[in-house]
Structure formats: C-alpha cells, structure tokens
C-alpha cells in the first residue's frame, strides 16, 4: 500500500510542503524531515501520533511561528516566509490548546477580535464586520450566549467561541492544536463534528493535532501519522487502518497498539480462526464488535468456521 510521501505539484488553492524539515535551532534539533504534504480545500486533516512525535511542532511550523530547518512551505504557490504578518493573518487562523482568560469580555467581543486583521488597531467594526461576527456565532451554535461573559462558559462552549473567532478571520486555513483536549466525551464528539462540517460546507482547510485517535478516524478526510524516527505518512482513514502502520507508529515500550480498540492491551492467546464473510457496509460494526472481545471464549472452537453475515 502506498501513502503520500511524494513531492506535490503546486496547486492554486493548496498549502504544500516540499522536503520540509521541522525542529528547533538552539540547539539544533530535527524532529522530522523530508515532509511532503498537500493540504486541499474542503478537507479535515488530523495529525495523530505518540507524545513527542512532533504534532505541535508541525502545526507551529506550518503556521509560521517556527522557521523550517530545511525545505519549503508554499500557500497558493507563494513561499510562507514571503508573507507579511498582516497578510498571513488573513490566510491562517490558529486555535491553541489552552483557552485564554478573558474575564471582562463577552462572547461577542471575543469573536469580534477575529476581525482585527481587517479593522486595524482601533478595532472599529463596520456593519459588514458585525454581520460576519453574527454569522459565525450562528454557525457554531453559540449565538444565544453572545451577551454572556466568556469566562462564565463551560469548556465546550469556550472552545466553540474560539472556533468562531477563527472563522471571523475569514481565512482559508484553520489550524487547531488539541481542540478537544480538556473536554468531556460528548463535547469532543460535538467539536470534531462541527469542524468536519465547517471544512466541507465553508470551503476551509482544517488541520488538527489530536490524541483522540478514534475520533480522528471517525471524522477526518485524511490522517497524518507521525512517530519519532519514522517518516511522516498520510492517507485516508481506511488505508491507514487497513495497514500495520498504527501498530508500528504507536508501539510503546514493547506494548502493541490494538487498532480495533485504539488502545494498548495484553496480547490474547489465539484460538482457531473464524472467517466472517460480511458486506462492506457492516465492516465498522464488526470492527466495533471485535474490539469488545466478546467473541473470546474459554474453550476455543474445535474447527475453523465461516460465518456469513448479510446486511
């Protein structure tokens, strides 16, 4: 199976990396090298990998916070380093992991800060700016909280506000570092679904770093897989899942990663194999069933069996 590790041609609407190396200068530390990725519109990309693999470093380099150690990043054919800070702020918006403390600002005022690249130093909102703020509040489902103080919101609501602020910048690219890191499970699902919908419906390229591997596979259009001392690979979720890459990239201190349960576990003693003949649309259901390990019995089957299952 082949994955995207080639040099891409420059597309008019793409953010592209060519032979990119990322890391730090003092002292010089290379985190990952020879990165060749192509980020297109209307797609949600999720970067996954173990701790310390370079997910945040890649995001910070793509957004211009860190300089590449080698190679190039281009946006619509223009090298990233050639963008002025003001022009870059109309191209890429960032949502960081840690939410800021803004005790004196309302939700509306926080979202309106996203218009700063267009309003200038004094931040005077024109009628068109106000219309943008109103629209993005509606888009993320937080308009009913517009007059409330930001610090009075739940963590999930605060994250929606920060996403709305990023949308108010009206940039084609939105980068988020662990956007669901401190949220409960229902809120994590809601945020990831929201981002997937925004990317598809608003013609955005959204790039997320995340430790939530199951949700990444559920929502992403493309997975970017990173691990220390391994090449960065990318592919659609089904390709990555069907390969052995998850087990290889997430191996930790000799513990094997279970791609069905998305967790580390003790290796089970195998009985005789059973082949399940199932229609393709039932594959996710069977994978979920296998991950529960309910099929394991104390006495292995006496012979291999074929079990046909129809939808």
Which residues are covered by each model-predicted region?
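A short, flexible loop at the N-terminus of ABC-type nucleotide-binding domains that lies
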Residues: 3-17, 21-34, 41, 46, ...
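The feature captures the beta-strand-to-loop junction immediately N-terminal to the Walker
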Residues: 48-50
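Helix-to-loop junction immediately C-terminal to a conserved catalytic motif
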Residues: 63
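Conserved ABC transporter NBD signature motif
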Residues: 71-79, 88
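Conserved ABC ATPase "signature" region
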Residues: 127-145
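Conserved ABC ATPase signature
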Residues: 149-153, 157
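Catalytic Walker B motif of ABC-type/P-loop ATPase nucleotide-binding domains
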Residues: 174-178
